[in-house]
């Protein structure tokens, strides 16, 4: 696999009128079980927690509902993770380390999971531990994970509002190999949204797709653009994952008056671990229970052989916009085409 690009250390200029503050009012604590910091520039607002894996808890246009699926009461963040920890479904946005089939094979703290080549749960030290607050300033937050004895990785996460793009948030992840030995890994962004969210991405052909389990999901592919179909009343529940090699570096999601566009560095297929896709959509949806299940919008960075102490970086740029049109594929794609130049995305 090709090596990843050297890691730069960009700084984010302070965004005028942006504020970063710890939510500590009684009203805030009543509505948010996890302690959090807020990034707010009067156009968008988001909340990030040091606990529960340095997780992004919310992102939305100012005054609009949270676009993310979140359950802040899912677990007790004061409980330190260990090698027997299960997964706690806080949801929101988090960063995993791939490939999934190697999650537990490089450690000896839990021999049973190593022997089984367990593919669940993800690394507890990266997903559940409290991160250290490295820096906070106007419009920016930097957090460090502990060094994980499971994956051998330490994560640094940076969340920052974007100068000149008041409707955008940049998410950066830096993964450093602390294992003391060569480690093949990738950075894996995972964003959870409610199950009835409609998702789109550019895909050239069906040869760039696979679904696991086979036949579990339905999609529409036309004109170089893929949409994941939602189950209709009377349809069987949908539960599975679509793996894709996108033709360009973006995906989009629409729900309840907001459109979220996630941009990332497009990679050749050879750069992505063969067990993964650069974009993966995990759907768990039941037509008659739209409040249940979820959709995961997942993006993989290149698979890299990291020397001890070496690091790799990846990022996503999130832009959220108001959307007042019909909840249909044609209307959504027309909206994306009309805003493509503004967003800086390529649409087939």
Identify what each model region corresponds to:
Residues 173:
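Beta-strand-loop-alpha "switch" segments that mediate conformational coupling across diverse proteins
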Residues 31-170, 178-348:
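Surface-exposed acidic/polar loop and edge beta-strand patches at domain peripheries
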Residues 14-27:
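Bacterial N-terminal signal peptides
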Residues 10, 17-19, 88, 217:
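Secreted/extracellular small peptides and ectodomain modules produced from precursors
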């Amino acid at each position: 696999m090709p090596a990843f690009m050297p890691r730069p250390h960009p700084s984010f200029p302070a965004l005028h009128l942006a504020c970063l503050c710890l939510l500590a009012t009684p009203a805030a604590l009543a509505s948010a079980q996890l302690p959090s910091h807020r990034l707010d520039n009067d156009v968008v607002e988001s909340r990030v927690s040091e606990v529960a894996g340095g997780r992004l808890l919310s992102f939305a246009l100012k005054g609009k509902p949270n676009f993310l699926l979140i359950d802040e009461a899912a677990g007790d963040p004061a409980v330190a993770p260990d090698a027997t920890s299960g997964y706690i479904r806080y949801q929101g946005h988090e960063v995993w380390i791939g490939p999934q089939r190697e999650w537990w094979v490089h450690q000896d703290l839990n021999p049973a999971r190593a022997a089984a080549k367990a593919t669940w749960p993800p690394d507890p030290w990266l997903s559940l531990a409290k991160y250290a607050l490295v820096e906070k300033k106007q419009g920016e937050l930097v957090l460090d994970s502990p060094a994980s004895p499971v994956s051998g990785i330490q994560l640094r996460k940076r969340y920052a509002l974007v100068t000149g793009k008041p409707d955008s948030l940049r998410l950066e992840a830096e993964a450093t190999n602390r294992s003391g030995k060569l480690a093949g890994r990738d950075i894996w962004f995972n964003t959870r949204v409610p199950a009835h969210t409609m998702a789109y991405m550019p895909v050239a052909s069906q040869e760039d797709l696979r679904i696991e389990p086979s036949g579990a999901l339905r999609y529409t592919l036309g004109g170089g653009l893929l949409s994941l179909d939602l189950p209709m009343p009377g349809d069987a529940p949908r539960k599975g994952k679509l793996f894709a090699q996108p033709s360009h570096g973006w995906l989009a999601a629409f729900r309840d008056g907001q459109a979220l566009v996630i941009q990332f560095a497009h990679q050749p297929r050879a750069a992505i671990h063969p067990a993964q896709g650069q974009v993966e959509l995990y759907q768990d949806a039941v037509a008659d229970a739209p409040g249940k299940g979820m959709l995961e919008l997942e993006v993989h960075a290149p698979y890299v052989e990291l020397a001890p102490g070496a690091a790799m970086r990846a990022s996503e740029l999130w832009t959220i916009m108001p959307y007042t049109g019909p909840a249909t594929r044609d209307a959504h794609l027309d909206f994306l085409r009309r805003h493509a130049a503004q967003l800086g995305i390529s649409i087939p």
